[in-house]
């Protein structure tokens, strides 16, 4: 959800993580100060740990390392891979958004990213997407590379089958989970 009260959201998160096979939870909160992010992590990280779910912080490798998150996800406009890796160290996960670019994904992989993300595949309410990703990118990546890839952007139970068939290792779902009745 775009805005959350972590004390209330904690129960919703536990229910969502317990409802199926969830590989990771990414905390993405914008427009708040660092202390709010820290407090949110303090409340939600134990929920993910209790479910055996990897906890990834969006955009902030410094806070991911400081607060004990399992990793960080960075976009093309965030800290670069090398800076993120230096902050979180070799044991934590660093994932990189690559939009629809094979080149960006190969660079991220060569630098040592733990996964790459392609998208947005569908219209999304989570953020303004400036690129439209194509199934061919997933197909090519899954045929040529061993590094896991994540499909992002507007993914629902109804529109995800082609992404899985094209080779996405993971699906990032936001609204489909949090807007579900």
Show where each model-derived region lies:
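Conserved N-terminal beta1-alpha1 strand-loop-helix module at the mouth
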Residues: 1-81, 86-114, 130-133, 140, ...
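Active-site beta->alpha loop and helix N-cap motifs at the rims of alpha/beta catalytic domains
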Residues: 65-66, 120-122
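Glycine-rich beta-strand-to-loop/alpha-helix junction loops that act as flexible
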Residues: 118, 150-155, 173-175
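Short, glycine/charged-rich beta-strand-loop motifs at protein surfaces that mediate ligand recognition
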Residues: 125-129
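Internal alpha/beta core interface subdomains
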Residues: 169-170
């Amino acid at each position: 959800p775009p805005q959350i009260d972590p004390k209330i959201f904690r129960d919703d998160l536990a229910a969502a993580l317990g409802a199926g096979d969830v590989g990771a939870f990414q905390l993405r909160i914008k427009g708040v100060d660092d202390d709010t992010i820290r407090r949110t992590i303090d409340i939600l990280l134990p929920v993910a740990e209790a479910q055996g779910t990897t906890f990834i912080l969006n955009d902030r490798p410094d806070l991911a390392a400081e607060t004990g998150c399992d990793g960080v996800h960075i976009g093309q406009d965030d800290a670069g891979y090398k800076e993120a890796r230096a902050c979180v160290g070799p044991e934590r996960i660093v994932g990189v958004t690559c939009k629809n670019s094979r080149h960006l994904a190969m660079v991220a992989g060569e630098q040592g990213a733990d996964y790459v993300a392609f998208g947005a595949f569908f219209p999304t309410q989570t953020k303004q997407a400036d690129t439209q990703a194509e199934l061919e990118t997933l197909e090519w990546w899954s045929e040529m590379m061993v590094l896991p890839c994540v499909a992002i952007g507007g993914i629902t139970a109804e529109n995800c089958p082609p992404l899985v068939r094209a080779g996405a290792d993971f699906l990032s779902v936001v609204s489909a989970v949090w807007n579900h009745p």
